[in-house]
Structure formats: C-alpha cells, structure tokens
Amino acid sequence: MHERKGFWDKNAGRYDRFMRKDQAAYEKMYELIRPVVKAKTVLEVATGTGLIAKSIVDAAVHIEATDASAQMILEAKRDNQSAKLHFSVQDMFRLPYAQKSFEVVIASNALHIVPHPEKALQEIRRVLKDDGVLIAPTFTHAGNSVSGKAKAFFMSMAGFPLHSRWTSEEYLRFLRQNGWAVQKSAVLKASFPLTYAECTKSEGPDVVL
C-alpha cells in the first residue's frame, strides 16, 4: 500500500498531462457514465486528480471522490468548482462509509493496480446499495499490441504498480467470479484497451456495446 501511494504521490503533478493522450477514450467513457449517475449519489475510489468526477458531477446529486494518495487529492481540489463534489483521502479497502450508502460506485483504472482486487470489490459491495451500479472501467493490458506490451513493460520498469494483466474477457470474467453481473461492457480504444464495465449485485443479461 505504501509503495503504491508513494508512486502516485510522486507523479500527481504530471498525471493530467500523462492522461491527455487518452482524452478521446475518456470523453466516450464520460458519455457512458453520465446517464448512470444522473440524479444519483456517487462514490468514486481511486479518483486520482478527479478527471472523471469533475466531468460527470453536473449529472449527479453528489459525488464523494476518494484516493489513497494525499498529493493526488491536493491536485484534485485545486480547480474543483462544484459544491456537489467532495474530495478526501481514503483507503478503498477500508472505506469510512456506512453499508449501502451509495447508488453508484466508480472504480476506474483501479483494480489492475492494487494487490487483492477482489478485496476492494468486497468493500465496494458493502457501501453500494443493493440495486446500485458499479462502474469499473479498467485498462486491460494483456489484450494489447506488441508496442503496447512494450510500453507496459517500460512503465513497470519505471515503478508503475501493475498487479493484474487481464484481457478484456479475463477482466469481465474476474468481475463475474467475484459476485458481479456485468450488465454492459465496451472496449474503448486508448493507449491500452480500456474495458468499460457496468455491474450490479444481481444476476442479469450482459449487454456488449
């Protein structure tokens, strides 16, 4: 945990610049997320500098956006102009919220960079309402081109905390194996394939975009 926070603390100031290359994929992702969070109470874990939260907050009732990195949260707070958006430092494995507090939980590009992602999903399940939605877009590095795999290798050498390399299919299977019904999924073109997933606690048919 401390190694992970150290990496993100050190790179918080350059995170937004690093993510600009994937702006088109993120804009598409925002389009998918906004209808889901409309008039809902939302928790985001691993918010980073708040790129997603700031882009969708107008649709939501309120967003609690959290990250384990204090420096990331400092960056996120700098240009927060919404009274509906609150940033705080939290551990996604030990969230301070009561059971079934949120209608939507967003965990974007988080599950592949933490050890024991299944435990993070358990904590998300605890704070999500029974009829709530988990939105969990994740870079699926294993389903990548040769150049992309080389890029992932050099990121790993630079200290990027990549713990799980999934293909899109493997990632969706991982979600299902941990008690989530994937209601909608799509693979967005980015630096690495970005697998978008909307999940519920209940069983239901999968819809692939």
Predicted regions and their residues:
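Class I SAM-dependent methyltransferase SAM/SAH-binding core
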Residues: L43-R94
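A short glycine-rich, Lys/Arg-flanked "PGG" loop and its adjoining helix->strand segment in the class I
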Residues: E118-D130
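Short alpha-helix
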Residues: H163-G179
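A conserved beta-strand element that flanks and buttresses the S-adenosyl-L-methionine
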Residues: I106
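Conserved alpha-helix/loop element of class I SAM-dependent methyltransferases that forms part
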Residues: K21-K40
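Conserved class I S-adenosyl-L-methionine
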Residues: I135-A158
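N-terminal, positively charged/glycine-rich alpha-helical extensions of SAM-dependent methyltransferases
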Residues: M1-G13
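Core SAM-dependent methyltransferase catalytic element
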Residues: N178-W180, K184-L209
